[in-house]
Regions:
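Nucleotide/phosphate-binding catalytic cleft detector across ATP-hydrolyzing
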Residues: 1-159, 167-287, 293-339
């Protein structure tokens, strides 16, 4: 691009759980979406992984905040500070001036006008001069190599931290979709409640996340099961330390209700799909992206329930970010970008 040195172009997957920034076709930031703030001065102390390590361990003068909840901005000031701080981390060489920034940011397909405005304002206040937005399922489709402008129907199920985005895409647009607030964070919360009620142990968000990653499963029978996982915490009745061993079968059981909600949402979108596009989807299968796609056995469970093949995308965690990066390079070409 002419005078590209005057403009810094960034693609941002502003996620509830993680934020990924792409610059010059490379992932330059991939950090948890969390900040640590000094309560007395309101100054930023840490962002990303450093702030995540403080989460649940702070004293009264330090507060950790996750700026996004259920896929949308819940704390405007914290979101702005996080975006600004993450952009500062990008090493683009020494500059004598602050470049004008062009940003493409992805948003949930079910976002209201107020929620879209909040994302735009946060990005602009953090230094974005030219801000575009793209719906997450469209970004996910681009990120896994789908030509979204053909008349062929493709279905994306993107299970992020805050929302599960389900969409049928054809001819450069979203034909039908549903965005539900049952996703990775909900799985983590399910595990915390299960441990509380079933094992009378209190565990934090980070420990529940570790359980989800280590022994999380959508099926109670796996061909290649993970080893059981041991977690430590206080007994809810006595406050004495206890050790509990968790199996993948238990986690499959405790996640069942949330997974049924996702299955029902997929069925709802399929019911809304025009017959010709439905036939394309049955032939091509349904694509799974997002961190939730990594849940063991999820593709098999969904195929068993819905009777359509499901494919876990290559590198599902970064599909949305990569698609946002592709959109950044095609701003003039893609009419589905939101100004």
């Amino acid at each position: 691009m002419a005078f590209s040195f005057l403009t810094q172009e960034l693609a941002m997957d502003l996620g509830t759980a993680n934020t990924v920034i792409i610059h010059n076709d490379k992932i330059v930031v991939d950090d948890p979406s969390i900040v640590a703030i000094d309560q007395n001065t309101n100054q930023l102390i840490a962002i990303g992984e450093k702030a995540r390590q403080m989460h649940g361990k702070t004293h009264e003068n330090i507060k950790t905040i996750r700026p996004l909840r259920d896929g949308v901005i819940a704390d405007f000031n914290a979101a702005e500070q996080m975006i600004r701080g993450m952009i500062k981390q990008i090493n683009t060489g020494s500059r004598w001036f602050t470049p004008s920034r062009r940003l493409v940011v992805c948003i949930p397909s079910g976002s209201t006008e107020v929620e879209i405005r909040a994302v735009r304002d946060s990005a602009e206040h953090a230094g974005g001069r030219d801000v575009y937005m793209i719906y997450e399922p469209m970004a996910a489709a681009l990120g896994i190599g789908i030509d979204v402008e053909t008349p062929e129907g493709n279905m994306i199920v993107d299970i992020g931290g805050g929302t599960t985005e389900i969409a049928v895409i054809a001819l450069g647009g979203i034909v039908c979709n549903q965005s539900i607030r049952t996703a990775g964070d909900g799985f983590t919360s399910d595990i915390q409640q299960y441990m509380r009620h079933q094992h009378t142990i209190k565990i934090g968000e980070r420990s529940a996340e570790d359980i989800k990653i280590t022994v999380g499963s959508a099926l109670s029978e796996l061909e290649d099961p993970p080893a059981s996982y041991t977690v430590h915490g206080p007994n809810l009745m006595t406050a004495l330390p206890v050790e509990v061993t968790v199996t993948y079968q238990e986690i499959a059981h405790c996640l069942d209700k949330s997974l049924v909600k996702i299955e029902n949402a997929i069925m709802t979108v399929l019911e809304q799909t025009p017959p010709e596009l439905y036939a394309d989807i049955v032939r091509r299968g349904i694509f799974l992206t997002g961190g939730g796609a990594l849940l063991r056995g999820l593709d098999k469970r969904l195929k068993g329930k819905i009777n359509i093949p499901f494919q876990v995308a290559e590198d599902p965690l970064h599909a949305v970010a990569r698609g946002t990066g592709i959109a950044l390079k095609n701003i003039g070409k893609f009419p589905f970008l939101i100004r």
